[in-house]
Amino acid sequence: MRLLVVDRFAKEAKALRRDFEARFADPRRATADRFVWDLWHVAGQYTALRTPAWEFFQKKAYDAFHQRLVWWGRRTLGCHDVSPPWLSCYVNGCEQRLHGDLPHGPVAFVFSLTKWATRSFRGGQTLLLRDEVLDFWRGFVSTRAVEEPEVLDEVPARFNRLVAFDPRIPHGVRRVDGSMDPTEGRLVIHGWFVQPRPFIEGPLPEKALEGAIHRITGAIAPILEAGLPLAGLLSLGFTVTPAGKATRLRTLADTTRTPKEHAPGRRRLLSLVRKALETHVFPRRSSPSRVTLPLVFER
C-alpha cells in the first residue's frame, strides 16, 4: 500500500465546513476565535496556516469525526490511535515541498474540507513521488520521455476525501496560487495513524493472539535472520470462528518494502505469515471475533 483514497468519508464533513466558514465569513470581524493561526514557514520547504484541529471546531461534530477516523484506522490499518491532528489552510503562496515523514507514524492521512469543485485557486494537490523514481535506473529506457506525470502522482483534495499513504515516500502539496481568503483556500485535517497493535471485536481475548504471533515469528525468523532487509507495516484482517479457526484472511494494508532484488524473499515471508495464521488454532468461543493484526518490520 502506498496510497488509499476514500471519498465521502465522514458525514460530519459539512458541519465542520460550516463551522469554519461561520468563523471567517466576515473579514472585518475581529473576535478572539479568529486569532488561531500559526503561519508555519520553513524557507524553501513549508508554508501554511495551521492550528490544532481539536481546539478549532465545535466539540460535537469534531468528536464524532475524530472517533470515525480512529475506528477506521483500527479496522483498516491496525493502528490504535491518531496523532493530534492539525487543521491547515493553504492560501496564495502556501505549499509543502517534497519530504518524508520519519518517524511520525506508519501511515499518514489528509482529510479534505476544501470546496474543491468550486475552487478559485490553482494547485493544492497532494503529491507523491512514484515508485519508478525511487528506483529510477532499474527500469530506465533511454528512448522514453519523462515528464512530471511519470515522476509524481497527484491526488486532488476533493471535499470529504480521506487520503492515507505511506509517509516514508517523498510527498508534498503543490503550491497554491489564488486568493488570500481562508474560506477560498485548501483546507485539510491531517496527521498520522499511530500505535499499531492488535484490535479485536468479539469475545476472543487479546492474550489469545500471543500464540499466533509466536507461530508467525517462528515461521519468518529464518528469512529475517538470513538478512532480508524488510521495513514497513503489514496489517492483516481475519475472522476467528467459534471453533477457533482463522477464516476470511485478507491483507488490509501493506507498506512493507525491500530493495527490488529481495522481492522474492518478501513474497515468501508474506506467504509464511498467511500460512501460520491459517493453520493456527485459537481458543473456542461462543461467537466469532473480527481481528486486525498489524505486524511492524524495522531495519
Task: Kindly give the residue locations of the regions a language model identified.
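Conserved hydrophobic/aromatic beta-strand scaffold that supports enzyme active sites
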Residues: 3-5, 87, 110, 154, ...
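Non-heme Fe(II)/2-oxoglutarate
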Residues: 1-75, 201-219, 231, 241, ...
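Charge-biased low-complexity segments
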Residues: 144, 150-152, 161-162, 168, ...
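Conserved double-stranded beta-helix
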Residues: 30-138, 168, 192, 202, ...
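Phosphate/oxyanion-binding loops and surfaces in catalytic or ligand/nucleic-acid-binding neighborhoods
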Residues: 23-26, 116, 196
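Residue-level detector of conserved, well-ordered beta-strand and adjacent loop positions
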Residues: 7, 88, 174
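Extracellular/periplasmic catalytic domains that process cell-envelope and extracellular macromolecules
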Residues: 102-105, 156, 182-183
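Double-stranded beta-helix
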Residues: 129-163
